[in-house]
A protein has these predicted regions:
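Short helix-terminating capping/connector loops at secondary-structure junctions
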Residues: 1, 63-65, 110-114
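Claisen-condensing/thiolase-fold acyl-transfer catalytic domains that form or cleave C-C bonds
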Residues: 74-131
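Extended hydrophobic secondary-structure segments that form protein cores and membrane-embedded regions
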Residues: 2-7, 117-121
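Active-site/ligand-binding loops adjacent to catalytic centers
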Residues: 3-90, 135-199
């Protein structure tokens, strides 16, 4: 299965595939609204005829429908990006859109519980860092319709225990007992912040 995903702010492909009967489908460009997934903020994709052709060929080779398109909100895109980043997957806004689309596909029964999904994240999150900062600072412009969730804000945090006297620095590495003390105290502090306990 291939699942396409579009924001409700830029969704001409999604709207095209809303019509279940291929013979009745008519492609209509849309006027896009501000979207965090800027690389996908296209209201009239020039490659749409090719997309339709390839999707039809792919569907025709399978015994059942294999091409799907889902729609997500800007809120879902940003929340998904932040969830991915909190869990160690550095995702851009388009990656957040992919993750939100996978969730929607599961909710709609397109992707079954026993199936595995592969998500496409097209860029490094640093390319779209301003959107993460807007999420942290509650500074999204109203047209994005994004209201940050406090629990998803993953601010960078300085970790330096008060009892730690020596830390490694450029040109000043630690060794021996100093390095051992640094590793032990930093590990203990991180475990404390995360609420981890020894097993």
């Amino acid at each position: 299965k291939i699942v396409g995903v579009q924001s409700e702010h830029a969704d001409p492909v999604y709207r095209y595939y809303l019509e279940g009967d291929p013979d009745k489908r008519v492609f209509k460009p849309v006027n896009v609204k501000a979207s965090v997934a800027q690389a996908a903020m296209i209201g009239n994709p020039v490659s749409m005829p090719r997309v339709i052709e390839v999707a039809n060929e792919y569907n025709n080779t399978a015994p059942e429908k294999k091409i799907f398109v889902v729609q997500v909100t800007e809120q879902e895109i940003m929340d998904s990006m932040m969830r991915a980043n909190r869990n160690g997957n550095v995702a851009c806004t388009q990656g957040g859109e992919s993750m939100a689309g996978m969730k929607r596909a599961v909710e709609q029964g397109i992707v079954k519980p026993d199936e595995t999904g592969i998500l496409d994240s097209t860029a490094h999150m640093l390319k779209f860092l301003s959107f993460q900062e807007k999420y942290f600072n509650d500074s999204f412009e109203p047209e994005f319709n994004v209201n940050p969730i406090e629990d998803l804000k993953n601010f960078p945090q300085l970790v330096k225990p008060d009892t730690l006297e020596k830390v490694p620095a450029p040109g000043n590495p630690l060794g021996g007992k100093d390095m051992e003390e640094f590793v032990n105290k930093m590990s203990a502090e991180i475990a404390n912040i995360l609420g981890l306990e020894k097993r």
